[in-house]
Amino acid sequence: MSSNVIEIYADGACKGNPGPGGWGAWLSFAGHEKELWGGELVTTNNRMELTAVIRALEALKRQCSVRIYTDSVYVQKGITEWVHSWKARNWLTSDRKPVKNVDLWKALDSLVQQHQVEWVWVKGHAGNVGNERADALANKGVDQVLGREVV
């Protein structure tokens, strides 16, 4: 782990798709850690995956070098590959349909312009400690919106 890079593990969870969902992010920098989580009563897994990354980037107080770990190919490819074409087509897909979750994609696109971001895809539920922590936080977000006790 490089000490001058903020490492972010982000994950989303959904009980039903759509259904109640949660997002979680674990930030680590120079021995300091921060946990973020939340949720929505009616959402989708993709919205929660995007929200996790957005909330993590919003928590940064200044321009930073950031390494974001996600198990969502949708988020990773969306922001590194697809977003450029979407913007060129005024937020339409290649078959001229509106991009889903455009509100979140626009927010994420704006936030990544403010930082130096490296995107790393990790396999979900495969024992990666950071990803497991983000997953637990996302599930905490689900529990919170469902009124379950959050520990």
From Swiss-Prot:
It comes from the Bacteria. PANTHER family: RIBONUCLEASE H1 (PTHR10642:SF26). Binds 1 Mg(2+) ion per subunit. May bind a second metal ion at a regulatory site, or after substrate binding. NCBIfam families: PRK00203.1. Keywords: Cytoplasm, Endonuclease, Hydrolase, Magnesium, Metal-binding, Nuclease. Mg(2+) 2 binds at D11, D135. HAMAP family: RNase_H. Residues 2-143 form the RNase H type-1 domain. It is found in: Cytoplasm. Its EC number is 3.1.26.4. Pfam families: RNase_H. Its cofactor is Mg(2+). Monomer. Belongs to the RNase H family. One of its GO terms (molecular function) is RNA-DNA hybrid ribonuclease activity. This is Ribonuclease H. It comes from Methylobacillus flagellatus (strain ATCC 51484 / DSM 6875 / VKM B-1610 / KT).
